[in-house]
Amino acid sequence: MRSSLAPGVWFLRAFSRDSWFRGFILLLTFLIYACYHMSRKPISIVKSRLHQNCSEMVRPVNDTHDLNDTTWCSWSPFDKDDYKELLGAVDNAFLVAYAIGMFISGIFGERLPLRYYLSAGMVLSGLFTSLFGLGYFWNIHMLWYFVLIQICNGLVQTTGWPSVVTCVGNWFGKGKRGFIMGIWNSHTSVGNILGSLIAGVWVNQHWGLSFIVPGIITAIMGVITFLFLIEYPEDVDCTPPRHHDDPEKEQDNPEDPVNSPYSSRESNVDIAASSSKEQGPEPEAISFLGALRIPGVIEFSLCLLFAKLVSYTFLYWLPLYIFNVAHFSAKEAGDLSTLFDVGGIIGGIMAGLISDYTNSRATTCCIMLILAAPMMFLYNYIGQNGITSSIVMLIICGVLVNGPYALITTAVSADLGTHESLKGNAKALSTVTAIIDGTGSIGAALGPLLAGLISPTGWNNVFYMLISADVLACLLLCRLVYKEILAWKTACGRSSGYKQI
């Protein structure tokens, strides 16, 4: 007697070949960018180890420091009173290089094979991350060494984001893009969490390993990328998606930001892409100015500048804030800071779902930004009153701060990079993504720098700066929110008209 089909085999057959390949690409690019973020996180965990109060620690027998020196166990040159400014300079070296490199990276990403470009970037990123940690074992105490390594790492890390967004955009159409990319974008928070946990293992003993281990993992992932990344569905005989609906159904002006893909009604069917692999002449890569003329690019880019300023200030300074204000150990502060990233995962998925359901990317971002401002104020004043309040407030702040950031860098970037005004030229995706994330990276560089300069005057002032940036991010979306509200009224009017008929 023959048995019935095994449940596992039944499950495998339930999905088409195209679905399996799409799932594989989604998972692979998820792991790729998680590694990028994992390699960025250790510096925020190790900061509290580079400069610490050593007054209660037992001095080694051969110590030559002055008996009144309370920073004898800190790592020179970060053992002086200006350590916050020096740590801010190290952060900013990476972030400024990243911001500058991002504008160039998108141009290269449109013109070079993504597999080579991405895998080379990951291997180099792993190398420079490890070199930072080797400064501990090589007993390097020169500021220029750490700054130079951060600059090089910032430049090579720009290979990541435009490449993975372009690759995912090649495989997935517009249908449920916000939800899919909301889940996928959790790689940012997953990478931050992994980076925090891995760095926390060695931060109190050999902090150099906090960089070397993530660096090695990132380099290995670069080799895996070279072996397995598939740029286009056509490369493995899969069906390419379409990015737009039937033109006859588009009754409104496609140049209107309300009717652009980030705010249009998304169908459940995969839509999409004319890719460069299709038959016929290959479309030219879009110019920088051409990408800026796409409706919505400038507004969302400037909004992301301030949203990313807030997010990256938390990324780089939250563990030190918890260490100084709540008086946890370096490892406990690093572990607790991961809750902000847990909230970021939830926020990214929520923002994607809500924007898909309401067809309103800008309004979703604006509402979350409005709610984030009072939550940051409350976290600063009551978040450290107990472990329970700290956990709850960190998760809520993570949801509201990282939700808009996640939505803009994923679904919005993909929507604008395949805008109707491009007339089927999907080669704009990497450039648009680079412009949006590059502009955001300027804010990412400014945030930690300002935090380093302002924190000596008190942490309250740092939070006032973050709240101000959050409000500015919201204001920059007002025009698009107004357009989306008009679109809702029009849609409701049509719906009422149909019911009367």
Swiss-Prot record:
**Location of this chain's protein in the cell:** Endoplasmic reticulum membrane
Residues carrying a glycan:
N53, N62, N68
Query: Which residue intervals are annotated with compositional bias (Basic and acidic residues) in the record?
Result: 240-252
Report the transmembrane regions from the record.
Answer: 19-39, 88-108, 118-140, 142-164, 179-199, 210-230, 303-323, 334-354, 362-382, 391-411, 434-454, 462-482
Relate the protein's function as given in its record.
Inorganic phosphate and glucose-6-phosphate antiporter. May transport cytoplasmic glucose-6-phosphate into the lumen of the endoplasmic reticulum and translocate inorganic phosphate into the opposite direction. Independent of a lumenal glucose-6-phosphatase. May not play a role in homeostatic regulation of blood glucose levels.
Induction comment from the UniProt entry of this chain: Up-regulated by cAMP in macrophages.
Give the encoding gene's name.
Slc37a2
One BP term from GO: glycerol-3-phosphate metabolic process
Name of this protein: Glucose-6-phosphate exchanger SLC37A2
Q: How is its activity regulated?
A: Inhibited by vanadate but not by chlorogenic acid.
